[in-house]
């Protein structure tokens, strides 16, 4: 009888579990994965090259579109790199606002990850639950920037504007009656800080709901326990960061080890796993959501008690306020020059990294003294994680490959750049 050879299977890029445009060429022995070869580049948009032909401010909106699930964290790294090269000091209130929105972004990312990962493994209920909370978080984005996703809110030297004193209200429509609208507007009567404070009080119960659905669910455990195990030393050697590294038991978190913005002023714990499997990474991310909620609450309390400026007073970098621009011709000219010609950055280089929801997101920037970068290099955490897929999936079943892709939390905007 002829020997049955391995066969190849093309997975994606249209597959719903591919999380974007991943194409995997899988070599299978029956249903067991022998080799996994990820093909990337289908979402390549030349962001690094585009940045060389734009001023520093004009490149900022491109950052939102890298990891398009963790928008403000990308902006944060970019602004930190520019501030490091300019040597400017960011007002403390702006640091707290950045820290707060960095954690709001972490919640946005982890909720998206939890919903889609649960859905990949067969629990479609969790997807609906997590998207319910994401709506409130998007409303926070919209309140400060006018955009629900690609905010472009952070600026070199601070943030675009201070937090608003009121929240937008829902109006009665054909879809929702007056009673439903009144319930939706119940927690929108005060300022944005009041709205965020209300969310932080409600959110722990929501996380409890997610854990009720999954943590002790025997099907969820069968799909994640012992799947994609990465020992601690191997995780370090493979360049893993963020929850992927902490899931293997290494307490490495840039917010603690190399604090930026206001992270050295807030109190939080770094959750770590034990075995380094998909289940541990799930537990780490769920606990991270609870810790992020703690940080947001501390930021809200501080911001309420401490008014102040939210952007540097260096007018070569910071644009004038919208109010001044509309009433004063000099301010209008200042605004126009800043957004068309930009500002010049002294020759040199800088690397700034943030504890992005997916891992260490870094920006390496080289300046030749012009108004645009000579070179911009983006260190995407998902790139290193996707490279480990072959090692993590080998010997597992085809269905487990989907769970492993899910546990990595990959987004192709940052991987392909």
From Swiss-Prot:
Disulfide bonds: none annotated. It is a peripheral membrane protein. Signal peptide: none annotated. It catalyses: a quinone + NADH + 5 H(+)(in) = a quinol + NAD(+) + 4 H(+)(out). InterPro entries: NADH_Q_OxRdtase_suD, NADH_UbQ_OxRdtase_49kDa_CS, NDH1_su_D/H, NiFe-Hase_large. Its EC number is 7.1.1.-. One of its GO terms (molecular function) is NADH:ubiquinone reductase (non-electrogenic) activity. Keywords: Cell inner membrane, Cell membrane, Membrane, NAD, Quinone, Translocase, Transport, Ubiquinone. One of its GO terms (cellular component) is plasma membrane. It is an enzyme of class 7 (translocase). It is found in: Cell inner membrane. It holds the Pfam family Complex1_49kDa. SUPFAM superfamilies: HydB/Nqo4-like. NDH-1 is composed of 14 different subunits. Subunits NuoB, C, D, E, F, and G constitute the peripheral sector of the complex. NCBIfam families: NuoD (TIGR01962), PRK06075.1 (NF004739). NDH-1 shuttles electrons from NADH, via FMN and iron-sulfur (Fe-S) centers, to quinones in the respiratory chain. The immediate electron acceptor for the enzyme in this species is believed to be ubiquinone. Couples the redox reaction to proton translocation (for every two electrons transferred, four hydrogen ions are translocated across the cytoplasmic membrane), and thus conserves the redox energy in a proton gradient. Belongs to the complex I 49 kDa subunit family. PANTHER family: NADH DEHYDROGENASE [UBIQUINONE] IRON-SULFUR PROTEIN 2, MITOCHONDRIAL (PTHR11993:SF10), NADH-UBIQUINONE OXIDOREDUCTASE 49 KDA SUBUNIT (PTHR11993). This is NADH-quinone oxidoreductase subunit D. The lineage of its organism: Bacteria, Pseudomonadati, Pseudomonadota, Betaproteobacteria, Burkholderiales.
């Amino acid at each position: 009888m002829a020997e049955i050879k391995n066969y190849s299977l093309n997975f994606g890029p249209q597959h719903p579990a591919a999380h974007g445009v991943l194409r995997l060429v899988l070599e299978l022995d029956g249903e067991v994965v022998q080799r996994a070869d990820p093909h990337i580049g289908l979402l390549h948009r030349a962001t690094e090259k585009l940045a060389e032909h734009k001023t520093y401010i004009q490149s900022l909106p491109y950052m939102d579109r890298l990891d398009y699930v963790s928008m403000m964290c990308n902006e944060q790294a970019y602004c930190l790199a520019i501030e490091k090269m300019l040597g400017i000091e960011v007002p403390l209130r702006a640091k707290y606002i950045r820290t707060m929105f960095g954690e709001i972004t972490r919640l946005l990312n982890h909720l998206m990850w939890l919903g889609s990962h649960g859905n990949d493994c067969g629990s479609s209920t969790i997807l609906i639950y997590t998207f319910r909370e994401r709506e409130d978080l998007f409303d926070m984005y919209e309140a400060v920037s006018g955009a629900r996703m690609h905010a472009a809110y952070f600026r070199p030297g601070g943030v675009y504007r201070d937090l608003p004193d009121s929240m937008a209200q829902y109006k009665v429509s054909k879809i929702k009656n007056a009673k439903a609208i009144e319930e939706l507007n119940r927690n929108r009567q005060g300022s944005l800080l009041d709205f965020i404070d209300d969310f932080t009080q409600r959110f722990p119960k929501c996380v409890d709901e997610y854990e009720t659905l999954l943590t002790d669910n025997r099907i969820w455990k069968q799909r994640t326990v012992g799947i994609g195990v990465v020992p601690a030393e191997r995780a370090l050697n493979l360049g893993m960061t963020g929850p992927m590294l902490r899931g293997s038991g290494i307490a490495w978190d840039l917010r603690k080890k190399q604090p930026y913005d206001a992270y050295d002023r807030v109190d939080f714990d770094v959750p770590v796993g034990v075995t380094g499997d998909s289940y541990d990474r799930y537990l780490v991310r769920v606990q991270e959501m609870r810790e992020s909620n703690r940080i947001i609450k501390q930021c809200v309390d501080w911001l309420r008690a401490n008014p102040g400026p939210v952007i540097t007073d260096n007018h070569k970098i910071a644009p004038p306020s919208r109010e001044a621009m509309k009433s004063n011709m000099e301010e209008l000219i200042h605004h126009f020059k800043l957004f068309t010609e930009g500002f010049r950055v002294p020759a040199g280089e800088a690397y700034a990294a943030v504890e992005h929801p997916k891992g260490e997101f870094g920006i390496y920037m080289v300046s030749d003294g012009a108004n645009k970068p000579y070179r911009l290099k983006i260190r995407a955490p998902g790139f290193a994680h996707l490279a480990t897929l072959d090692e993590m999936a080998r010997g597992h079943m085809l269905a487990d490959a989907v769970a492993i892709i899910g546990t990595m939390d990959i987004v192709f905007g940052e991987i392909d750049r």
